UniProtKB/Swiss-Prot annotation:
Residue intervals of the MADS-box domain: 3-63
InterPro entries (alphabetical): SRF-like_MADS-box, TF_MADSbox, TF_MADSbox_sf
Protein name: Agamous-like MADS-box protein AGL97
Domain of life: Eukaryota
Recorded coiled-coil stretches: 88-130
GO cellular component: nucleus
UniProt KW keywords: Coiled coil, DNA-binding, Nucleus, Transcription, Transcription regulation
Lineage per the UniProt record: Eukaryota, Viridiplantae, Streptophyta, Embryophyta, Tracheophyta
Gene3D superfamilies xref list: Transcription factor, MADS-box (3.40.1810.10)
Cell location: Nucleus
PROSITE patterns cross-referenced by the UniProt entry: MADS_BOX_2
Pfam families reported for this sequence: SRF-TF
Self-association state and partner proteins as the record states: Interacts with AGL27 and AGL62.
Single GO MF descriptor: protein dimerization activity
Length: 266
């Protein structure tokens, strides 16, 4: 015997889990009934439902024929929704016997079908490129990592050990170089100090020379004054020499006279 089907009371379900289950089932049933009504009566329907939980990812659940936006916009404007069907869906075309009109409708449908297939190919190509690019990159990275680890397990370990020993030797050499650099720093310090000393000595020599120059200038001034005195003495000597010349000329002239007198006496 089949069990008796228990009816659910039409009131708010307090428990969250049964409420969510009931919402999901009855929403799908409502959409199914609305789609049947649209097909049977050519009605345009829009259904908007809020989710049960406030933490849901979806803000609204909607169903519409021909579209929710078209029906809601027509409702807000208080107008009949625009007919968005294709022109060949008109009932008058089904009863038409005009071959040219039917041929035009078939051409329009074939063109639309060809465009839809082209768009579908482009969509599939884009999805394949988006799917395969990350996968191929990931595979390449994994292969590269495995190759590196495989090689590192055998040869690169020995190289790492030898590199460590070489690094230890290099560290020792670096310590010696540091000591040499310390010695060079001391040498540079002594050289710079000696250069500063030589510069200071040269400055002292310059000051001494300047002082000596002042003394030499005073000596030169005194020598100039002495020379002036000597020049005065020389002038006096020249005057004396002039007097002597006169005396000598006088004596020579007197001797010449005496000689002439003696010759006359003879």
């Amino acid at each position: 015997m089949g069990g008796v089907k228990r009816k659910i009371a039409i009131e708010k379900i307090q428990n969250k889990n049964p409420r969510a289950v009931s919402f999901s089932k009855r929403r799908k049933g409502l959409y199914s009934k609305a789609s049947e009504l649209c097909l049977l009566s050519d009605a345009e329907i829009a259904i908007i439902a809020t989710p049960v939980s406030s933490n849901s990812n979806a803000a609204f659940y909607s169903f519409g024929h021909s579209s929710v936006d078209n029906v809601v916009a027509a409702f807000l404007a208080n107008q009949r929704p625009c007919d968005e069907r294709f022109w060949w869906e008109d009932e008058s075309l089904l009863k038409s016997e005009n071959l040219e009109e039917l041929r035009e409708a078939m051409d329009s449908m074939s063109t639309m079908l060809r465009d839809l297939k082209e768009l579908e190919k482009q969509r599939d190509h884009q999805t394949q490129t988006l799917i395969h690019q990350p996968c191929s990159a990931r595979v390449c990275i994994q292969d590269y990592v495995t190759v590196n680890f495989d090689g590192f397990n055998t040869e690169e370990q020995t190289l790492a050990v030898s590199d460590n020993s070489n690094n230890n030797g290099l560290l020792g050499n670096l310590d010696e170089c540091n000591e040499d650099f310390d010695d060079l720093d001391q040498i540079f310090d002594t050289v710079t100090n000696s250069e500063f000393l030589s510069v200071n000595l040269e400055m002292d020599d310059v000051t001494v020379n300047s002082e000596g120059n002042t003394e030499e200038q005073t000596l030169a001034v005194s020598d100039n004054s002495n020379n002036n005195g000597l020049l005065g003495n020389l002038d006096e000597c020249n005057e004396d020499f002039d007097d002597l010349d006169q005396i000598i000329e006088y004596l020579t002239s007197s001797e010449a006279l005496s000689m002439n007198l003696k010759m006359d006496d003879v």
